[in-house]
Amino acid sequence: MNINDKIGIYPGTFDPITFGHLDIIKRACKLVDKLIIGVAENVNKHTAFDTKLRTSMAENEIKGLGIDADVISFNGLLVKFAKEQNASVIIRGLRAVSDFDYEFQMSWVNYKLLPEIETIFLPASEDTQFISSGFVKEIARLGEDVSKFVSKGVQNELINLNRIKNGE
């Protein structure tokens, strides 16, 4: 790691991590010298998986793909976390126009808080643009196959989650 290296943060709840997230991660790695995947301990959002498991799933996914990135959980303001990690850029994925409105507002707030940290938006690839963690959890809850959206390891975690919820 060089002092002049560009560090990027790709934040999210990753509840669970999907092929859409992995697509953005692969592409983001080409834009920065070091990528940090920030797993948010989001107190305002109920998550199916705890932070430790979401972090572990993300680590397993990137390791399995040979991606060189760090996975770090964080709580609080994203820009504060980015500053602590010496990041100069936040990378966000956009699935559809509906994502843009929210993400644009957040990037403006982040800029007002720390103008030295830029936000880059990466549009989702055509084959991942409609994948969402929420849809994946719902499909899995209904007992359907989610292999088009998540890896086998994540599928197994979803199966375990549903067994626990069903008292099995």
UniProtKB/Swiss-Prot annotation:
Cell compartment(s), UniProt: Cytoplasm
Protein's GO biological process: coenzyme A biosynthetic process
Pfam families the UniProt entry points to: CTP_transf_like
Cofactor(s) needed: Mg(2+)
EC numbers: 2.7.7.3
UniProt pathway annotation: Cofactor biosynthesis; coenzyme A biosynthesis; CoA from (R)-pantothenate: step 4/5
Annotated substrate binding sites: T13, K45, L78, R92
Residues flagged as site, Transition state stabilizer: H21
Gene Ontology molecular function, alphabetical: ATP binding; pantetheine-phosphate adenylyltransferase activity
Catalytic activity of the protein: (R)-4'-phosphopantetheine + ATP + H(+) = 3'-dephospho-CoA + diphosphate
Origin: domain of life: Bacteria
Binding site for ATP: T13, F14, H21, G93, L94, R95, E103, T128, Q129, F130, I131, S132, S133, G134
Enzyme category, top tier: transferase
Broad class of the protein's primary localization: cytoplasm
Keywords of this entry: ATP-binding, Coenzyme A biosynthesis, Cytoplasm, Magnesium, Nucleotide-binding, Nucleotidyltransferase, Transferase
Cellular component terms (Gene Ontology): cytoplasm
Function: Reversibly transfers an adenylyl group from ATP to 4'-phosphopantetheine, yielding dephospho-CoA (dPCoA) and pyrophosphate.
Assembly description: Homohexamer.
Family the entry assigns: Belongs to the bacterial CoaD family.
NCBIfam families recorded: coaD_prev_kdtB (TIGR01510), cyt_tran_rel (TIGR00125)
Protein name in UniProt: Phosphopantetheine adenylyltransferase
